[in-house]
From Swiss-Prot:
Keyword NADP: no
Cofactors, names only: pyrroloquinoline quinone; Ca(2+); heme c
NCBIfam families linked to this entry: PQQ_enz_alc_DH (TIGR03075)
Gene name in the database record: adhA
Family the entry assigns: Belongs to the bacterial PQQ dehydrogenase family.
Keywords carried by this UniProt record: Calcium, Cell membrane, Disulfide bond, Electron transport, Heme, Iron, Membrane, Metal-binding, Oxidoreductase, PQQ, Respiratory chain, Signal, Transport
Protein name in the entry: Alcohol dehydrogenase (quinone), dehydrogenase subunit
Record's catalysed reaction(s): ethanol + a ubiquinone = a ubiquinol + acetaldehyde
Binding site for heme c: 650, 653-654, 693
Keyword Methyltransferase part of the UniProt annotation: no
Pfam families recorded: PQQ, PQQ_2
Length: 738
């Protein structure tokens, strides 16, 4: 009990005894201000999470991942009185995607670069902080920012993954290291290519910590691992795609060798690139079915013809796979996108519900996945029940009502036709990692939906991989939007974002809330008939859960992509969210991503209550990277190759066609482009490796790096006056740049 800070609220009971502690020699350190003793949640406590509604004990609050809290002190009648209670500035102004946990008044929040913080949930006072010291050169091994989506809590320990592939257990009271393991075994690496990263939240099931990874864009063979929560010893590992030689190597051996291998070509590029199928987000334990569900990712490479010679369904890409938590043994699977060639992962949030269907209540999985369809699947057997598109789709006309298999639009099979395909949804999906929520009071699922088209174009001349780069099998010179006002205006008209309130019983939309653009935050539903969501334009909103009416908004000054949580501290209800825009949408879409609303990142955690007394957030820079007049001369004979090299190695972080969205440096205005040696010192020699800009000397020669510099000077000259003019409005903030 920690009465000094948390009053007389009853703590969770500790139902498991501490096991063996395994020390690990790993870099990292904790700094501690002061900490009080929160007690340990266990699986039994999480199963009965509603007995402790003031806590947020696991990623989705309960094992069902519904992100619904019964707390109702804050409700429709008084939410307009909500005020900022406290804020805590974070270490880095990059994207923040984490779901904080709150156990007995202590908040455990993971932040960018895999840092962990324990915070007094009533005051925002930092109790301790742990930095695992992720090497800066790991940043370019991941597709979509060095984010972290959250932690797990078990028996007095807090667990989280690091971007360089570790799983760390800390003492929740002190922040001291208990154990640390490398989750990426040597046999998972592809020769010298190590592209695995970890940014998802681990999950706890029956005393095991389960974690996946990402990396399919570079070349990876997906898997999940389960570790003993007390010791860190690996219990089992399940690969999601076969061994290319069809040899045994994990708990997945039997099903991969007997069921999955024949769905792949024996000689496609997957045998060298790993095949993909990384489980980078959704892992759910269901105590009702006693199963662990995995959301399996896209292929590596994306291009189906190159990956598997255009043959087979490629199990278990784009699938939900159910395993036994004790052993990792396969139980069932349902493949949502056979023959994936659009980056239609199944990693999006898996939620379980008890749903009335044809006169009986069935325990089901509901899944609003990237491909634009809302699936209802029997949670115990994997039987397809129904599916309906929740956003506009043009790649399929629907799903087979018996099997759930997509009814493909033949033109969408671009890898087989050899023609370009303007896909909706595009690779970012109708729903991505941003959490959806369910309210048992309304019976609705609330989806942070979006529309971001993508031009799919085959890589010419066959598949040619590039080390430490995206290897999609696409022509990266053509997937970008041309730099013309007409082309950009046409594309911008197709960029959309909404809350879609979906009735799962009717498989129909109930209503929607329109947003300025895509890439908004996750959603929280509460017993006060409220929905909370942060937006890309820096606003934090509360909506009426029955009809979507906007009841409250707050200027957070930075874009929000994280999902909110709610909890009790000293008997008072709070709502909190991590602030900081990032991820692949602003990274790659660059200037076009500003259509969702321009903000400059000032990453922090903010918390609200009905009697908050923090006052407004401090005024900070809101103009971002200012344009600097570039050198006037460039070599036009080198800029075409510079564009190719930039799109291959640089665009995923610094923006399509070298236009940044303000999260990472906009290279058009970098002082280094003025001097050949200065630019090579950064790009070739790695002068800024500690900050996440790894050296590319091993992948490009000095001539190719200089070609990039010439291209950047060209782009700076083409866009300088446009950017200057955009900052001449009353607020000095860039408007949309068509």
């Amino acid at each position: 009990m920690i009465s000094a800070v948390f009053g007389k609220r009853r703590s969770l009971s500790r139902t498991l005894t501490a096991g063996t502690i395994c020390a690990a020699l790993i870099s990292g350190y904790a700094t501690m201000a002061s900490a009080d003793d929160g007690q340990g949640a266990t699986g039994e406590a999480i199963i009965h999470a509603d007995d402790h509604p003031g806590n947020w004990m696991t990623y989705g609050r309960t094992y069902s991942d519904q992100r619904y809290s019964p707390l109702d002190q804050i409700n429709r009648s008084n939410v307009g009185n909500l005020k900022l209670a406290w804020y805590l500035d974070l270490d880095t102004n990059r994207g923040q995607e984490g779901t904080p946990l709150v156990i007995d008044g202590v908040m455990y929040a993971t932040t960018n670069w895999s840092m962990m913080k324990a915070v007094d949930a009533a005051t925002g006072k930092l109790l301790w902080s742990y930095d695992p010291r992720v090497p800066g050169n790991i940043a370019d091994k991941g597709c979509c920012d060095t984010v972290n989506r959250g932690a797990a809590y078990w028996n007095g320990k807090v667990y989280f993954g690091t971007f360089d592939g570790r799983l760390i257990a800390l003492d929740a009271k002190t922040g001291k290291l208990v154990w640390s393991v490398n989750t990426i075994p040597p046999e998972a690496e592809l020769g010298k290519q190590r592209s695995y990263t970890v940014d998802g939240a681990p999950r706890i099931a029956k005393g095991r910590v389960i974690i996946g990874n990402g990396g399919s864009e570079f070349g990876a063979r997906g898997f999940v691992s389960a570790f003993d929560a007390e010791t860190g010893k690996v219990d089992w590992r399940f690969f999601t795609v076969p061994n290319p030689k069809n040899e045994p190597d994990a708990a997945s051996d039997s099903v991969l060798m007997n069921k999955a291998y024949q769905t792949w070509s024996p000689t496609g590029a997957w045998t060298r690139q790993g095949g993909g199928g990384t489980v980078w987000d959704s892992i759910v334990y269901d105590p009702v079915a006693d199963l662990v569900y995995l959301g399996v990712g896209n292929g590596s490479p994306w291009n189906y013809k190159y990956r598997s010679e255009g043959k087979g369904d490629n199990l278990f890409l784009g699938s939900i796979v159910a395993l036994k938590p004790e052993t990792g043994e396969y139980v069932w699977h349902f493949q949502e996108t056979p023959m994936d060639q659009w980056d239609f992962t199944s990693d999006q949030q898996i939620m379980t519900l008890d749903l009335p269907i044809n006169g009986e209540t069935r325990h089901v999985i509901v899944h609003a996945r990237k491909n634009g369809f809302f699936y209802i699947i029997d949670a115990k057997t994997g039987e397809f029940i129904s599916g309906k598109n929740y956003v506009y789709v043009n790649w399929a006309s629907g799903l087979d009502p018996k099997t759930g298999r997509p009814i493909y639009n033949p033109d969408a099979l671009y890898t087989l036709t050899g023609k370009e395909w303007y896909g909706i949804p595009g690779d970012l999906g109708g729903h991505n990692f941003a959490a959806m929520a369910f309210s048992p009071k309304t019976g609705l699922v609330y989806i942070p939906a979006q529309q971001v088209p993508f031009l799919y174009t085959n890589q010419v001349g066959g598949f040619t991989p590039h080390p430490d780069s995206w290897n999609l099998g696409l022509d990266m010179n053509k997937v970008g939007i041309p730099d013309s006002p007409e082309a950009k205006q046409a594309f911008v008209k197709d960029l959309k974002g909404w809350i879609v309130a979906w009735d799962p019983q009717k498989q129909a939309e109930a209503w929607r809330v329109d947003h300025k653009g895509p890439w908004n935050g996750g959603i929280l539903a509460t017993g006060g008939d409220l929905l909370f969501q942060g937006l890309a334009n820096g606003e934090f909103h509360a909506y009426d859960a029955t009809n979507g009416s906007d009841l409250f908004h707050f200027a957070a000054d930075s874009g929000i992509i994280a999902p909110p949580v709610t909890y009790l501290a000293n008997g008072k209800q709070y709502v909190a969210v991590e602030v900081g825009w990032g991820g692949i949408y602003p990274f790659f879409l660059g200037g076009l991503a500003r259509t969702s609303g321009w903000t400059v990142n000032h990453s922090r955690i903010i918390a609200f209550s009905l009697d908050g007394k923090s006052g407004p957030l401090p005024k900070q820079n809101d103009q971002g990277f200012l344009p600097v007049k570039p050198p006037a001369q460039f070599d036009s004979k080198r800029t075409d190759n510079g564009y190719f090299q930039f799109q291959t190695y640089c665009a995923a972080c610094h923006g399509d066609n070298a236009e940044g969205a303000g999260v990472l440096p906009d290279l058009r205005w970098s002082g280094s482009i003025r001097h050949e040696d200065a630019f090579y010192n950064v790009v070739g020699r790695g002068a800024l490796t500690a900050y996440g800009m790894d050296r590319l000397h091993g992948n490009m020669n000095p001539t190719e790096i200089e070609d990039i510099r010439q291209f950047l000077i060209k782009r700076a000259n083409e866009t300088y006056q446009r950017e200057v003019d955009a900052r001449k409005n009353a607020d000095g903030i860039p408007e949309q740049l068509p």
